[in-house]
Structures are given as C-alpha cells and as structure tokens.
C-alpha cells in the first residue's frame, strides 16, 4: 500500500518548489479504475489508489495559484505482463467476469488518451464508456473543466 502512495508523494514534494519558482508546471498521478470504487479482493491496492486520488484532489487546489496543473489517470485493466500474470493466477472470479464485460485496453490507448486529456486541460483520464461512467459517478469534489462532464455529474447526483 505504501509503495503506490509514497512513490508519488516524494517526487511531488521534490518538484513542486521548483515548479513554483518557475511559475508553471504539471503533475500527473497514475491511479486506477480500482481507485474510483472499492473492489472485493483488492483492498490494499484500491486503498492506495484512492489515496492518490485524494492527494491529487487536494494539491490541485493548493497549486492552482502557482499555475501548476494536476491530472489523474485512472486506467482500466491494461494489457501488460503484470496484468496477464495476475489474470491467469490470482484474479478473483468476479473480476474476471467484469473484465470480460469491460474489456482490456492497450498501454498505447491509455497513454494517448492521457496525453490528449492533459493537452486539453482535463483533470481525470478514464478509458471507454465504463470508465467515463465511473468518472462521472465518482467525481466528488474533484475539479471539472468539461461542461459535458459537469452536466452529467449534476444530472446523476443524488440530493441529500
């Protein structure tokens, strides 16, 4: 758990002072679709990715006055060696079924979509329709720069 979180915290702490001095910058965090909603069998992983999202949400607000932008990538199951090994050996059966429905994306698809979103000023990058719905459903207090996304979030929000 600590590995996923602190390997993002320490480099961020190192680069932020220099970015502030420079007057601009961008920090990108790699979370996961599993960091948007809790998944059975993924407790430590999901918790660490939720923590990254919380860190990104907070520092995005703190760094805005310094012209430093922040983005979060929440990729779905991605076709990598680690994923293939995990899928073949230890992935819970419920996740295998979800993967069959949601599909698997290539690392190239994930990278291209994130770079495009950064260039267009988006805070959150997701992949596919299921990822988009997750982004809308788990927006919370995260910044939103897309009018369409903001409308979808407002339309699906429950009143309390």
Model-derived features: where do they sit?
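Active-site-adjacent segment of SDR/Rossmann-fold oxidoreductases
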Residues: 37, 58-68
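Residue(s) in the substrate-gating loop at a strand-loop-helix junction
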Residues: 32
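Catalytic tyrosine of NAD(P)H-dependent dehydrogenase/reductases that use a Tyr as the general acid/base
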Residues: 9, 45, 128
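Active-site helix of classical SDR
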Residues: 12, 48
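A short helix-coil junction within the Rossmann-fold of NAD(P)-dependent oxidoreductases
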Residues: 14-23
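SDR active-site lid
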Residues: 65-134, 141
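Active-site loop immediately N-terminal to the catalytic Tyr-X3-Lys motif
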Residues: 37-43
């Amino acid at each position: 758990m600590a590995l996923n979180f602190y390997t993002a915290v320490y480099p961020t702490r190192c680069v932020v002072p220099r970015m502030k001095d420079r007057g601009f910058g961008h920090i990108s965090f790699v979370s996961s679709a599993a960091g948007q909603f809790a998944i059975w069998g993924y407790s430590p992983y999901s918790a660490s990715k939720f923590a990254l999202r919380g860190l990104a949400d907070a520092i995005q607000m703190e760094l805005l006055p310094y012209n430093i932008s922040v983005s979060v990538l929440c990729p779905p199951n991605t076709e990598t060696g680690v994923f293939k090994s995990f899928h073949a050996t230890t992935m819970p059966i419920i996740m295998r079924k979800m993967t069959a429905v949601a599909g698997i994306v290539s690392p190239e698809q994930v990278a291209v979509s994130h770079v495009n979103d950064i260039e267009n000023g988006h805070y959150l990058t997701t992949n596919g329709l299921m990822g988009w719905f997750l982004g809308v459903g788990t927006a919370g207090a995260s910044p939103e720069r897309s009018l369409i996304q903001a409308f979808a979030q407002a339309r699906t929000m429950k009143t309390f």
